[in-house]
Amino acid sequence: MHLFTVGVNHTTAPVSIRENVAFQNEHLSGALRDLNSHGIREAAILSTCNRTELYCNTDDPQKALEWLANYHRLKPQAIAPYMYTLPQENAVKHAFRVASGLDSMVLGEAQILGQMKQAVRIAENAGTLGTLLHKLFQRTFSVAKEVRTNTNIGANSVSLAAASTRLAQRIFGALNNQHVLFIGAGEMIELCAEHFAAHRPLSLTVANRTLERGQELAASIGGTSMLLADLPDRLAEFDIVITSTASQLPIVGLGMVERAIRARKHKPMFMVDLAVPRDIEPEAGELDDVFLYTVDDLAQIVQEGMENRQEAAAEAEAIIDMRVENFMQWLKTRSAVPTIRALREQAERHRLNELEKARKLLARGHDPAQVLDALSNALTNKLLHGPSHALNSATGEDREQLEATLRQLYQIHH
């Protein structure tokens, strides 16, 4: 069993790279089966705004990297400088740290655990999880729970949603005179909507592809909803735009923003693009009256209050180190399984051979007591031939070591 994690995250790659290797959840099952067919025995894919990671059971992690590049129609060398490949123990520790929020842009954030569980459910339904990854993720979720229960890692955590609100306050001051637009209606937008709603802006509007889901979210925050198709005509109405959809292509183009700014008579517009791939064309941020921030730009704000959680992080790391050691012990026992199986199969062949001989002798009328005696002697000789021959053939230190091992194996204490 060879465990590897291959991936990119917010510390190794900018959003312009991460968006090129991101996966939408609805495409993950097909992607996993495709990865499986390229020599990867087991696989799960975790894809969020901050990371894309492949958890694999494979002899050759290079295959996973090449598959990732080919799947997204990229050259492997284009993403290789941003990728990390973590083998065995490092992969286990990484999974535990990710689920516990220690590897997040927002230290201690809880959202990643739900995202990881969803990734595992998708892999399970796709049939790409085996013994190794099942056990890894079972332990991962257990460790994450232990970390959150026994440390204050999640205390005073500044989420991306909260960071967006703080940044808007830095631009506008109080938010009670602003019109706010949310594009999308997923979990991230829901969190942002709750934070902005608490500041009682002039209006809250949710734009979504399907009106029903948009209306549902809008109702929960005392806002209104609109269709995404109406965005080009209505963008100018809003001072603050927060977007996070699963679109593979930008929803808000440079031209749309230029028209909105002209219609607003160059009144500033604050925009936060939390999507990966990005929802807003980055060129829009170059306009004089547009303050455009991506998920990477929020990093500085979410670092605030980090010092308060460093002690909790150290406690969490200690728990994780201990649990990694436990998992590696399990993994070592699993590596002996093929040998144990082969040993049992060999013993079973000897048993069946001698049993067949005994049955033939009994059928010919031989004395049952003598047949049983011959059977037991033959089995003893067959089963001990290998160890005896190895011990007789060994010399020097090898012989001493082998003798000690055999005494331990057969529990010979005299």
Curated annotation (Swiss-Prot):
What Pfam family is a match for this entry? GlutR_dimer
> Which InterPro entries does the record match to this protein?
4pyrrol_synth_GluRdtase, 4pyrrol_synth_GluRdtase_dimer, 4pyrrol_synth_GluRdtase_N, GluRdtase_CS, GluRdtase_dimer_dom_sf, GluRdtase_N_sf, NAD(P)-bd_dom_sf, Shikm_DH/Glu-tRNA_Rdtase
Intrachain S-S bonds: none
Report the EC code(s) recorded for this entry. 1.2.1.70
The organism of origin for this protein: Methylobacillus flagellatus (strain ATCC 51484 / DSM 6875 / VKM B-1610 / KT)
Lineage, top-rank taxon, reads: Bacteria
Q: Which Gene3D superfamilies match?
A: Glutamyl-tRNA reductase, N-terminal domain (3.30.460.30), NAD(P)-binding Rossmann-like Domain (3.40.50.720)
Biochemical pathway = Porphyrin-containing compound metabolism; protoporphyrin-IX biosynthesis; 5-aminolevulinate from L-glutamyl-tRNA(Glu): step 1/2
Give one GO molecular function term: glutamyl-tRNA reductase activity
Please report the name of this protein according to its UniProt entry: Glutamyl-tRNA reductase
Enumerate the CDD domains for this protein: NAD_bind_Glutamyl_tRNA_reduct
Q: Which GO terms describe its biological process?
A: protoporphyrinogen IX biosynthetic process from glutamate
- Binding residue positions for NADP(+): 184-189
